[in-house]
């Protein structure tokens, strides 16, 4: 069984490095559990800290502009901010935004400090970053332990024994230089207390084929029905169809009235229902990346249902419940949520020259793998993945290059490449399109009759430039490292069979913060274009797009933009 707050290595033991520098540190991508929010309106703020409702920052601006409200904390260099006064074991996470050159640290109860950013993994100034810390207090038999320090989804420290301290101090944050903003501060005291138990046996039924729709079950072939004392994927032992659906139903008795957090972990597909209401909808994913929800419950019994569909991922199913000051308590059997096999991470570095790897890539929320993906690692530490079928720039990241364990370990059946650094997901569609209607929706995919990949060429440094045909025109696409990100240059030649549009960015939110500079997806990354250009910012179906018309003159045109992250 996997404990989401244990110090066990979720991604294997010591990494095996393949590439160019065998002694370089390699960091593992880490998933995080959502924590109860800290009431920042109840904190006592020193004079150099203030509450705010919004923050405005530029990558070159040394100070932060704030708006009225109480959802953020903004601090300048000076006195420490106390978050928790008498901590024991705890989990803490926060989003942090920094001005250029800013630095800040968190002081643990033992007096040791940990940084809130990392030179190799930190995002550009003015972008939101994530910090996740797990800590175990000292006991009579052992010193305190920093279970985990994760910055931007990458584990930097794990299972670190700390020097013994004569005192148990508060948790504080100190700004050393510049200014920072904090939001979504989550905190959980990890007390070992049982807060719920099954009121009786659970009923479960198994059906052939996978689905997440309960109303589909009566139409599927029934395979098995029985009871169990706790949720257990192993109840399906002996079922012959590889793909099937399990429905668990039971009554959960909770000890207190309060806000309970449920954490659902699974490999495959799953849904959680509490008192008849669907509270978690989880589609295809691997074990480890939990989905969480907070629910207000009265003391006593509540109906709980878990629908689980086995797909191609390694199967497993676990459900945890907790109050704001307790460790997550498992509502499943030990064998239902297996620990991953202790496999060393096989990492590829790109320290001496660019490295190109063809592989499959599976994006979060997608069922199908991207089977024609090219990932490029650069000595500058700026890496990216392109879907050659769609000529879509899928993801960009900083830090170490590629985790190829699922490609090269044993049979390598998944054939999946995963980023080893701080990853940023982009809109996974082509950036160029021929659209006869300027108001037409951007296509989710493009057929081979419109877009055809032609190949790639390497420059003297070993960086690729891809070539493809698009609606009668020929396009070369060159992505190169820049000081703070990647520059993408697309040259078009020939004659397109309609107006050509470049979609520079797409996401839930696009904000112009300076002339030619846009923050995307709640300051997840920036895009920069020539300030003289006049793009169109469109909103449709709750999403925004930044579109740029491309005019071919004398059979040629160039589009260039920069991604800063």
Question: Where are the predicted features?
Answer:
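N-terminal secretory signal peptides that target proteins for export/translocation
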Residues: 1-10
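Beta-strand-rich recognition/accessory modules
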Residues: 470-471, 482, 487, 495-507, ...
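Extracellular/secretory pathway-exposed regions associated with glycan biology
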Residues: 186-261, 265-349
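Carbohydrate-interacting regions of secretory-pathway proteins
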Residues: 29-253, 329-334
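Solvent-exposed beta-strand/loop surfaces of large extracellular or lumenal domains
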Residues: 156-166, 234-235, 272-294, 512-549
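Acidic (Asp/Glu-rich), glycine- and aromatic
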Residues: 104-109, 316-325, 492-512
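Beta-strand-rich N-terminal accessory domains
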Residues: 30-41, 84, 333-476, 485, ...
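Bacterial N-terminal signal peptides
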Residues: 12-24
């Amino acid at each position: 069984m996997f404990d989401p707050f244990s110090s066990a290595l979720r991604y294997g033991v010591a990494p095996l490095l393949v590439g160019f520098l065998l002694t370089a540190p390699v960091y593992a991508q880490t998933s995080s559990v959502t924590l109860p929010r800290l009431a920042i309106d109840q904190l006592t703020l020193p004079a150099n800290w203030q509450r705010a409702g919004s923050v405005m920052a530029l990558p070159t601006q040394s100070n932060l502009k704030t708006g009225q409200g109480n959802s953020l904390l903004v601090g300048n260099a000076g006195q420490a901010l106390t978050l928790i006064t008498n901590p024991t074991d705890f989990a803490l996470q926060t989003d942090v935004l920094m001005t250029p050159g800013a630095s800040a640290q968190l002081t643990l109860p033992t007096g040791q400090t940990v940084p809130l950013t990392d030179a190799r993994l930190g995002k550009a100034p003015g972008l939101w970053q994530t910090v996740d810390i797990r800590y175990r207090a000292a006991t009579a038999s052992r010193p305190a332990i920093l279970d985990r320090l994760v910055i931007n989804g990458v584990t930097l420290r794990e299972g670190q024994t700390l020097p013994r301290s004569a005192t148990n101090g508060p948790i504080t944050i100190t700004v050393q230089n510049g200014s920072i903003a904090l939001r979504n501060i989550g905190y959980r005291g990890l007390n070992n207390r049982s807060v719920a138990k099954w009121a009786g046996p659970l009923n479960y039924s198994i059906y052939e084929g996978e689905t997440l729709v309960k109303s589909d079950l009566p139409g599927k072939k029934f395979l098995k029905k029985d009871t169990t004392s706790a949720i257990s994927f192993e109840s399906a032992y002996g079922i012959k169809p590889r793909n099937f659906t399990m429905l668990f139903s039971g009554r959960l008795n909770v000890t207190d009235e309060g806000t309970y957090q449920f954490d659902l972990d699974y490999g495959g597909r799953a849904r959680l229902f509490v008192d008849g209401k669907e509270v978690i909808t989880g589609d295809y994913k691997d074990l480890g990346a939990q989905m969480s929800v907070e629910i207000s419950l009265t003391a006593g019994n509540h109906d709980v249902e878990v629908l689980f569909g086995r797909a191609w991922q390694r199967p497993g199913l676990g459900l945890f419940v907790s109050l704001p000051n307790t460790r997550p308590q498992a509502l499943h059997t030990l064998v239902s949520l297996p620990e991953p096999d202790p496999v060393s991470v096989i990492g590829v570095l790109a320290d001496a020259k660019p490295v190109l790897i063809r592989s499959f890539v599976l994006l979060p929320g997608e069922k199908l793998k991207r089977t024609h993906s090219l990932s490029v690692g650069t000595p500058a530490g700026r890496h990216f993945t392109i879907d050659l079928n769609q000529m879509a720039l899928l993801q960009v990241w900083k830090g170490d290059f590629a985790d190829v364990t699922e490609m090269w370990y044993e049979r390598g059946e998944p054939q999946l490449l995963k980023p080893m650094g701080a990853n940023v997901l982009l809109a996974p569609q082509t950036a160029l399109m021929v659209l006869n209607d300027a108001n037409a929706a951007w296509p989710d995919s493009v057929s081979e009759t419109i877009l055809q990949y032609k190949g790639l060429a390497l420059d003297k440094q070993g960086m690729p430039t891809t070539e493809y045909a698009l609606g009668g025109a020929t396009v070369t696409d060159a992505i190169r490292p820049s000081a703070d990100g990647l520059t993408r240059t697309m040259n078009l030649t020939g004659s397109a069979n309609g107006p050509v549009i470049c979609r520079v960015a797409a996401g839930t939110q696009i904000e112009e913060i300076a002339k030619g500079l846009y923050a995307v997806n709640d300051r997840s990354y920036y895009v920069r274009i020539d300030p003289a250009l006049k793009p169109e910012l469109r909103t449709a179906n709750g999403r925004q797009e930044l579109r740029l018309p491309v005019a071919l003159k004398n059979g040629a045109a160039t589009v260039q933009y920069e991604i800063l992250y």
